């Protein structure tokens, strides 16, 4: 969740009926009553579900982190069952935007669903699941 121009925004992972992964954004003025705002999608189908999205800005760049399910493995990339990575967002995620190629946070096997927060001294801390059961 983040606040922009006096409005609170919340981003959630989604899967369409056509098995296309995306994120959805809701807005609220009071953090109690939420209404649908918009969808965030890649230009082409990218996985069937975007879990645990996290949107934040760091050093002038905008990040949309997500654990994407349903990626087909390549020779050395996307071979894990559980992917955790991010898109760089160009433009306004609430309006006109484009997403970069998906980049992995980690090339190991056990880092999933990362979320981040900003500390009082301005550092961004990211935490995620480790030791997946599969």
Show which residues each predicted segment covers.
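Carbohydrate-active catalytic/glycan-binding domains of CAZyme proteins
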Residues: 1-134
């Amino acid at each position: 969740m983040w606040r922009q121009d006096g409005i609170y925004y919340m981003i959630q992972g989604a899967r369409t009926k056509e098995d296309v992964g995306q994120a959805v954004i809701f807005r609220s003025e009071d953090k109690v009553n939420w209404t649908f705002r918009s969808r965030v999608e890649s230009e082409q189908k990218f996985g069937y579900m975007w879990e645990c999205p996290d949107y934040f800005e760091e050093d002038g760049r905008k990040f949309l982190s997500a654990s994407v399910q349903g990626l087909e493995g390549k020779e050395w990339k996307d071979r894990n069952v559980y992917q955790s990575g991010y898109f760089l967002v160009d433009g306004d995620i609430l309006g006109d935007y484009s997403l970069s190629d998906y980049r992995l946070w980690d090339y190991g096997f056990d880092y999933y669903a990362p979320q981040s927060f900003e500390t009082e001294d301005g550092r961004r801390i990211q935490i995620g699941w480790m030791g997946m059961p599969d």
